[in-house]
Design a protein with these regions (language model features):
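Juxtamembrane intracellular "pre-TM" segments in multi-pass secondary transporters
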Residues: 3-12, 197-231, 425-430
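Extracytoplasmic gate region of multi-pass secondary transporters
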Residues: 36-37, 225-272, 276-279, 366-367
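Helix-breaking motifs and short loop linkers at transmembrane-helix boundaries and internal kinks
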Residues: 48, 80, 101-107, 118, ...
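Conserved MFS/SLC helix-loop-helix module at the cytosolic interface between two early adjacent transmembrane helices
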Residues: 67-106
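Helix-to-loop junctions at the C-terminal end of transmembrane segments
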Residues: 68-80, 278-291, 374
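Cytoplasmic helix-loop-helix junction between adjacent transmembrane helices
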Residues: 105, 111-150
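Helix-loop-helix hairpin linking two adjacent transmembrane segments in secondary transporters
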Residues: 145-198
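C-terminal transmembrane helical hairpin of 12-TM major facilitator-type secondary transporters
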Residues: 292-338
Length: 430
């Protein structure tokens, strides 16, 4: 039964503090994930890591979540978002510490594995927390704003060679300890959210039904076709964005485009800098128009264009980065709030868990494949052409993401034509 939010909603100050706490949770989490890319060239030069090993550091982050995030989503439904947020941020902190301690590849990989086990379930729990407290007319805007603040962590990770130049000058390890500091901030934000949610939960703005007694795999068959098209879009899109931008882009810009570490990381950071400001705008557009499928397609089409420009036009790294940044601002702001439309409240954690599980399968495979392509093609500063197979690989995945959104738009228009409901478009995508 829904609670009367007019009488029961906590004060604005309490809600704002809770929102800020969740923002710090995700800011630190995003910084930790993106902390590998700025030191990728140093790992290659100082520790003699291959590109396959560098790719593995982010791939192994995704590996456990192929199997665990659906379970994590169910745990969020059963044990509440607040408990899972605190537990997973603590695990991420431990993983960040182990990564910083690891001068050997197996130790560093173990740290990234621990970080990954906690991180993606944390994302599911945070999304559910936002839905529980802020679902309503401006949910897409609030979700997008939270995502923007999280991406500020990624932007700071890319800019860290500039504002923490002294740490990078001392080798690969001090920047990893900086990532630990951000993990501590994430854990502090989780504690703030935990305390406030425990105190205010009975008066929340969205009273979800009790969680199911047990997970039934038949729930997978209950989700609508539109949901699975969203999953396909998610997998293809993120299999491009994070393996390229968060693993190989800075190294590619250094070796293939001749940029310094500072210049390459600054250019790469513009992808997330654009998202910090533009994502809430696109979230507001979604709230105001409800044209989910059209907005998804508009955001997705820019992704293959960005790689087409990068491959075919010399000196086009800036233009490609612009297209990538707009796409990354646009599509996620629409994609994740749209999941709520097709998921029963009692299965919301499971729905996000399924999507995140398959997303991580794509991230794992794409990181490994991209690193393998670079190694087998001899990609390096003396052979910049060796990066071409990786770029074409990401370009084809980008095209697949766009085709999924086009199919969603076609499917939705067909459903609307068949229903021909005179009372309005209600819950349909447009």
């Amino acid at each position: 039964m829904m609670i009367d939010s007019r009488a029961a909603t906590p004060s604005f100050a309490v809600q704002a503090l809770m929102y800020v706490g969740l923002a710090f949770v995700m800011l630190g989490n995003y910084y930790g994930y993106d902390s590998v890319a700025p030191v990728a060239e140093q790992l290659s030069r100082e520790l003699h890591f291959t590109d396959t090993q560098i790719g593995t550091l982010n791939a192994i982050y995704s590996l456990p979540n192929i199997f665990l995030v659906v379970v994590g989503g169910v745990l969020v439904d059963r044990f509440t978002a607040r408990r899972m947020v605190v537990g997973t941020t603590a695990l991420c902190l431990v993983g960040a510490v182990v990564t910083a301690l690891g001068a050997q590849f197996p130790v560093m990989a173990a740290g990234r594995l621990l970080f990954g086990i906690g991180s993606e379930t944390l994302s599911v729990a945070t999304t559910v927390a936002l839905a529980q407290w802020f679902a309503g007319r401006y949910f897409a805007l609030l979700f997008a704003a939270n995502l923007s603040l999280a991406r500020l962590g990624s932007y700071l990770a890319d800019r860290s060679p500039s504002f923490a130049h002294g740490l990078y000058a001392r080798g690969w390890q001090p920047p990893m300890w900086l990532a630990v500091g951000f993990a501590v901030a994430s854990f502090a934000g989780a504690l703030v959210y935990f305390v406030l949610d425990r105190r205010e939960a009975p008066r929340g703005t969205l009273a979800l039904p009790p969680p199911p007694e047990r997970f039934d795999w038949r729930h997978l068959l209950s989700f609508r076709s539109e949901y699975w098209l969203l999953v396909g879009t998610c997998v293809a899109f993120y299999s491009v964005i994070f393996p390229f931008r968060s693993t190989f882009a800075i190294k590619y810009l250094q070796q293939a485009q001749g940029l310094s570490l500072d210049a390459a990381s600054t250019l790469n950071s513009y992808v997330f800098l654009a998202a910090v400001f533009a994502t809430p705008v696109f979230g507001l557009i979604l709230d105001r128009t409800g044209r989910n499928a059209r907005l998804l397609a508009a955001g997705a089409v820019l992704l293959p264009l960005s790689f087409l420009v990068l491959v075919t036009l010399p000196g086009s790294a800036g233009l490609s980065t612009t297209l990538l940044g707009v796409s990354f601002s646009f599509l996620p702001a629409v994609l994740w709030p749209t999941v709520v439309r097709y998921s029963p409240p009692e299965q919301l954690g499971t729905a996000y868990g399924i999507m995140t599980t398959l997303q991580n399968a794509g991230l794992f495979g794409a990181n490994i494949i991209a690193g393998y392509l670079n190694d087998t093609s001899g990609a390096s500063a003396v052979n910049p052409g060796g990066y071409a197979p990786m770029l074409w690989f990401f370009g084809l995945l980008s095209l697949a993401a766009f085709l999924c959104t086009a199919a969603l738009l076609w499917f939705d228009r067909g459903s609307a034509a068949r229903s021909a409901a005179p009372a309005g478009h209600g819950g349909q995508l447009t």
